[in-house]
Each structure stands twice: as C-alpha cells, then as structure tokens.
Amino acid sequence: MENVEARYVDLDKLRNIGIMAHIDAGKTTTTERILYYTGRKHFLGDVDEGNTTTDWMPQEKERGITIQSAATTCFWKGYRINIIDTPGHVDFTAEVERALRVLDGAIAVFDATAGVEPQSETVWRQADKYNVPRIAFMNKMDKVGADFYMAVETLVTKLKANPIPVQMPIGSEKDFQGVIDLIKMKAIYWVSEDGSVYEEREIPEELREEAEMRREEMLEKVAELDEEILEKYLEGEEISEEEIKRILRKATIENRAVPVLCGAAKANKGIQPLLDAVIDYLPSPLDLPPVKGWRVSDGEIVYRKPDENEPFTALVFKVQVDPYIGKLVYFRVYSGRLEKGSYVYNSTKGQRERISRIVFMHADKREEVDYVRPGDIAAGVGLKVSQTGDTLCDEKEPVILEKIDFPEPVISLAIEPATKADEEKLVKALLALSEEDPTLQVRVDKETGETIISGMGELHLEIVVDRLKREFGVNVRVGQPQVAYRETIKRPAEAEGKYIRQTGGRGQYGHVILRIEPIPEEEGKNFEFIDKTVGGVIPKEFMPAIEAGIKEAMMSGPLAGYPVVRVRAVVLDGSYHEVDSSEMAFKIAASMAFKEAMKKAQPVLLEPIMKLEITTPEEYMGNIISDLNSRRAKIESLETRGHLKIVVAKIPLSETFGYATVLRSLSQGRASYIMQFSHYQEVPEKIAEKIIKVV
C-alpha cells in the first residue's frame, strides 16, 4: 500500500476526467490500458474475456457494455488522475449526465473506422451542456477500414467541433505501427508486446513530407486560436513546443478546440501519449470557474472556490449498494475539507449526517483515507439519507448546488414476487435500486395493487430485473412492458368546482372557478399554476391547497387514467366562507373543477416517440424499412457509412417491444440499433380508441 499522504497531490496536478464513447468504440479497453500503464493493474484486462476492472458488475461482464460508472484513481508522472467511467448505452444516459456534472474534462473515444456514431452525438451534446473540455482519441487504428482523417472530419460535420490533430498515424489497419507527434516532430513506436515500452525515433524518410504538411495544418489551426501567435505565424517565425501546448490548453479548457490523438488500445499502442495529453490539455480544478450554488437562507447565488479554507461543499453523483459495506455514496468535493467521522449537512434534505469512513475507489477495490480536499472524488460510508444530486456542505454555511435533471421514464412493467417468501425482499431490493438510480421509478397501482417499475427503455428494465435475481436473490414474475402514455388538452376550457358539506357543527366550503389551457410543447413545461383572482375572493393561504388539488387530479386523466401533462391552470374566481372554508374543501373543489374542465378541453392521448438509429449491411435495408413502415415509423434519413447503411427513424415506443429479436431475424443478426426517447406526440384517433377501450 503506498503512503496515503503521497496521494494528496497539489490541486494543479489533479485531473478529474471521464471517458465517453459510443457503445463499441473501445472505451472500457482504453480505461483498462490507462490503469495498466499507470501501474495500478497487474494483467491486461480484456472486455471480450470479461475480466476488466471498470466493468465489474456481472451483467456488464456478460453483455460487454458498461452500466455503472465506477470511479477509479491512478497516477501518471506525478499527477493524479481520477477517472469516472461513463456508460455508452442510451438507456443509461442519466448516468452519463450525472458523471459529466462532476468531471472537469473528458477523453472522447471514437472508432477510427466509423468516426462519430449516433450515440457519440448524444453524449457529446450532454458534455456541451455542462461545458466539459475534451480531447479525442481515435481508437482501433489497427482495424480494417480505419481512416484517421475521415474520422476526424466527422467531428466537424456531425458535432460542429474544432478538432486539431496533434498526431498522425504511422500506417493503418494491420500496418498500424505507431504515431508521429506533430508538436515534437518525433515518431513513437511501441516496442514491447504489452505496450509498456515505447521509444521516440526520427520520423521515417517516406513519411517526412506528409508529417510536415500535417504539422503545418496543425500550426495554422493553433495560430487561429491566439492573435499573438497568429502574427508570429504569418511572419514565418518559429512557434515553440511550449507555446503550442499553452495555446492548445487554453483553447481546450475554453471549449474552442479539441486536440485529437490516435492509437489502438487493444493492441497496446497510443495510450501513454494520451495520458500526457490529459495532463497537457485537460483542466485541473483550478482552471475552471468556481462552482455556483444557492444559499439556503435567502436563495442568493454564492460561489465556492476550490480551496481548503472555504466552507465544505460537495455533490453526490452516485449511490451504490455494496454487498459488504452497505450504502456507498460517491461525491465530488468542490471546496473545503471533510474528515472521516465528522458530521456533514445534506442541504437538499435538510438533515445532518455522520460520515463514518471515506474511501477512494479503484474500480472494485477500495482504500480508506482520513480526509478529502477540493477536487477529490471519493465515496462515503454511513450517509443514510443522501441520494444522487444532493448537496453535502458545512452546516454553518449551507448551500445547494444545482439539481441534476433526469428525464422522465417512458416504459413500465408490472412486477411481482414469484413466492410469498420473496415479497419482503422485493420491496427492500426495489428501494435500494431506485435510490441508486433516479431514472427508475417504483409505484404501487392503487386499483390493482400491482408493483409497477418504470424506466428509460426495455434494456434498462431488463437489467433491473436481472439485478433483482442476481444481487438480491429475489425471484420475480414480470408482465408485458407497458407504454407510459400521457393525456393533454387541445383547447382552453373553464369549469367551476363547489364543495359544500353541512353536517352538524362546522361545515366544509370551497368554491373555485378555473380555466385550463394547453402549454405548447416547445415551452418544455408540464404544468403551470397562475392565480388571477382579484379582491381577495379566495384568501391567498388557500392557493397552495388549490394547486395541490389540481396536481392530484392531474395524476389521472379523463380518457384512460394516464397522467395529464402540458396544462396551464388559471384560477379566475371563486368564493369562501369565513368559518367553513378549509384547505381540504378547496383542494376538493379545485380537483372537481379541473376534472370538469378537462372533459370540455378536447382531451387527447399522447405517446412516447423514440429516435431509432439502425446500422445494417445494405442487403437487409429494404426489409428493415418495410418493417418500420408497418410500425408507424417515420424515416428521417438514410446514410451510407462504408459498406453499412444507417437508417434514422422516429417510431412510437409501443411499436418497438421485442424489436431486438425482430431486427435480428430481419438481418441474420448483422444489424444493430440504438434507441432513445425523443418526445411525446398525439396518438392517432383509431389507435387511441383501442388503448382507451383496453383501460
């Protein structure tokens, strides 16, 4: 075990990074190799063999996809690098969002034969949302069809990025031997089988001319980033290695450029220069603006600098239930210092908690430490109420960092224990899982008494059911997947609700006149409440009760009992009784008025529409498209990428159940697809009638 004190590097020598990628770009292998060359890993893990470090849940080992973002720490040239592994599958985009929120920078890994693939666009846009600086790694340069410059070009066409290649490959496909560093103008070759020994040599004569041309292209792009350097460049002066790196670093941190490197992680080539680039171009916590929060007492905006003397502030970005030590709460420290055994205040929940132990994680091993400082990513033991997105802080100076927004689930499944004995275990297990994953919702259907789980897609729920069996030993039976329909209105309507009860003694009196109107989808709001009463016809203290009554009525719409969305409720008028009026009476009156107005407002059913991207060999395309047409899909684009076709379509979720099996048989297993939620849309009348009948 190394000396723990040695683990605390100066803040400028700390890098918190994520590795983001499309599902098969080779992200896990890249992470593995990083851990191997930084000396934390004693054998080379290989995803295809199922023994990698970051993919450590059994389901991931079988499926070869990364689901849980495990935080890992390693050292390189005196710098400490914390890596958050982010999942590349669309059903887990919430997990990606959460990881990006706490990162300072990222490596985007691409497959050099494909460049930007559909899922990489989604992850890239999420990284844009949180202004995460990134460098790009074109992986799989040894694969048939690898084309470095084509892949770089897709960063421009698909992502509108400003890529600046700082390397050029030596050969490609089976002849890929190494890289040329365009800043130093040296060739780098990997000498040993495991890639741990590499050496710099002079650039081979036959590549010299191309290397000079590529360096010129790089210098031109670097010069455009800085006026002083541009002048030097135009006057033909020499630009030093330090200057190039300084300008590139600044531009990367400001999200104005993306340095691009290449390699073949599986063939153990290109990883050490990638680690150098993490240090050269990605920010330390000191390079980024202070984190913004809201003071609990008055809602004023406050900023916290990455300084040990500031009050403690941290954000919880992951909760895992560890079979041995119970609940592990992963957090990122933004300011201040926290010792193990001390108390911390959860400002989101308004409760103080004691953190009994603090651990630094190495994918699935852990190392205990006495305290954490700004920039640290650690996991705490003993925090009972803390959940993802919560702020942990100093009780004397409480702040709330912004909440992380998670998308609404679109698919539901009824689930029941296989035996009586599983009943209690199921409740506990679902509680633990929904605590870990905010996009998993669990509720009990009032009418049928069934337990319903809802999530982001079929794969998401399959994995939940799988984990119930595997981790919690609960056997369950599941129903057919159900679409999370919604209801809304097409025109404004008014209605009145009066609730009057006169039974000996005190009565009940509530009277509300409401108008409801549709909220256009582009406003992105599901509900708005406006009080337009004048002259105190309804005292202000009853307004929250009226709003609560409306919200309760919205949980079950008039057509088929689905939740109501995109409705603005305006209280126009009403009356009250000095003695008999109560919150309860107004809540009921508001609910009555809302239900009445809904009936008049031309209610319609909405269904989730998914964005579907299918990659297929050309010969199956005809069958795939005619099948899509039979599923009410709208084809949006057809693209050719190499010998493959990419079909992009919007399709109702209800038409996609079991699609994996259908696509497999249509393409003899050669086509693949990814799917993610796009928007809600009105259900065609004929289909709506059938849905309403069933209910």
Curated annotation (Swiss-Prot):
Organism ancestry: Bacteria, Thermotogati, Thermotogota, Thermotogae, Thermotogales
An MF annotation (GO) of this entry: GTPase activity
A Gene Ontology biological process term: ribosome disassembly
Pfam families: EF-G_D2 (PF22042), EFG_C (PF00679), EFG_III (PF14492), EFG_IV (PF03764), GTP_EFTU (PF00009)
Domain tr-type G, first and last residues per copy: 12-286
Official protein name in the record: Elongation factor G
Residue positions binding GTP: 21-28, 85-89, 139-142
Function: Catalyzes the GTP-dependent ribosomal translocation step during translation elongation. During this step, the ribosome changes from the pre-translocational (PRE) to the post-translocational (POST) state as the newly formed A-site-bound peptidyl-tRNA and P-site-bound deacylated tRNA move to the P and E sites, respectively. Catalyzes the coordinated movement of the two tRNA molecules, the mRNA and conformational changes in the ribosome.
PROSITE patterns: G_TR_1, G_TR_2
GO CC field: cytoplasm
Family indicated by similarity: Belongs to the TRAFAC class translation factor GTPase superfamily. Classic translation factor GTPase family. EF-G/EF-2 subfamily.
NCBIfam families per the UniProt record, alphabetical: EF-G (TIGR00484), PRK12740.1-3 (NF009379), PRK12740.1-5 (NF009381), PRK13351.1-1 (NF009891), small_GTP (TIGR00231)
UniProt gene name: fusA
Highest taxon listed in the record's lineage: Bacteria
Keywords, alphabetical: Cytoplasm, Elongation factor, GTP-binding, Nucleotide-binding, Protein biosynthesis
Source organism: Thermotoga petrophila (strain ATCC BAA-488 / DSM 13995 / JCM 10881 / RKU-1)
Compartments, as annotated in UniProt: Cytoplasm
